[in-house]
């Protein structure tokens, strides 16, 4: 409870740092804890060929550090130094609100979010011309809500249409599927999906909903679903569900230009997070991995 209170201290926190989420995606996770859980920093110890390292587990994006007190850049640097006492190599994906030391050269990654405080009419008016066209096309396509679709159905749709275009392994996606099923079972998630006229699932999305934030963890669509604008229709439904409330829709990315255009087409803006590397490997191994991102 103390851990989760610290993670929840940020308004509309991302789900990745909560203990129940970490327990699913990284059962052997560890952490740095300061004081009475005033600052917490999840770590993910791994070992390969006798070399200890840490990197984020699949199913997470930015993972801390989290705090209930102001966290300066000096604090963040001290946490990093403490963490690296345990690893020869570290990849850290730092949360959007984290202050970075000025001499760090951490890489910026995109993450698109949308506040739904405004009315639906105001939010829809902010859609791009392309998004409005896609939505109109979907509304004319005789798509039907797939009320009985399951997480398994949406994962299968993703595997059939997207997996071979990515570097994501079957083990990765099966692990994520367990997290999604848990979230839906615990009422911490929502599944939206549509069938075509032939009762075939053509698009599905699973969002994790927790502490005033809905995060799109899986977005699956067939080629026909994309062609008729089904993903746009589902996101529009999600916006309608939360319009007029103090809520954040988190699209999770992306740095891929096409996806960035798609999500920003709903009026979403970029809330970047940061990739920081600490490379203390022996000299004969150091060149194989990214350099330390600080000058």
Each model region followed by its residue ranges:
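A conserved beta-strand-loop-helix scaffold within acyl/acetyltransferase catalytic domains
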Residues: 1-50, 95-227
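A local structural micro-motif
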Residues: 15, 90-91, 146, 250, ...
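Conserved acyl-donor/pantetheine-binding loop and adjacent beta-alpha core of acyl/acetyltransferases
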Residues: 47-62
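Hydrophobic beta-strand segments of well-ordered beta-sheets in folded domains
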Residues: 63, 85-92, 246-249
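Non-catalytic accessory segments adjacent to catalytic cores
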Residues: 72-111
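Terminal substrate-recognition subdomain of acyl/acetyltransferases
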Residues: 97-141, 245, 253-295
């Amino acid at each position: 409870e103390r851990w989760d209170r610290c993670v929840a201290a940020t308004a509309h926190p991302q789900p990745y740092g909560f203990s129940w989420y970490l327990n699913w995606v990284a059962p052997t996770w560890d952490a740095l804890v300061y004081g009475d859980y005033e600052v917490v920093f999840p770590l993910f110890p791994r070992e390969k060929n006798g070399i200890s390292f840490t990197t984020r587990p699949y199913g997470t994006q930015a993972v801390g550090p989290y705090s209930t007190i102001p966290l300066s850049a000096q604090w963040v640097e001290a946490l990093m130094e403490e963490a690296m006492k345990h690893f020869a190599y570290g990849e850290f994906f730092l949360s959007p609100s984290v202050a970075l030391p000025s001499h760090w050269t951490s890489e910026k990654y995109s993450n698109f979010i949308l506040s739904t405080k405004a009315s639906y009419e105001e939010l829809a008016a902010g859609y791009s011309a392309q998004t409005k066209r896609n939505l109109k096309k979907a509304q004319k396509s005789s798509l039907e809500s797939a009320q009985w679709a399951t997480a398994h159905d949406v994962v299968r749709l993703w595997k059939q249409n997207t997996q071979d275009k990515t570097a994501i392994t079957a083990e990765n996606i099966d692990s994520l599927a367990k997290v999604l099923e848990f979230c839906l079972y615990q009422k911490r998630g929502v599944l939206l999906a549509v069938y075509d006229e032939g009762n075939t699932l053509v698009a599905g999305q699973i969002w994790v909903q927790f502490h005033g934030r809905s995060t799109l963890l899986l977005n699956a669509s067939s080629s026909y679903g994309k062609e008729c604008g089904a993903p746009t229709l589902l996101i529009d439904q999600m916006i309608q569900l939360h319009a007029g409330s103090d809520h954040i829709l988190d699209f999770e990315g992306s740095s891929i230009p096409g996806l960035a255009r798609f999500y920003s087409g709903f009026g979403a803006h970029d809330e970047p997070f940061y990739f920081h590397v600490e490379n203390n490997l022996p000299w004969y191994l150091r060149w194989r991995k990214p350099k330390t991102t600080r000058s």
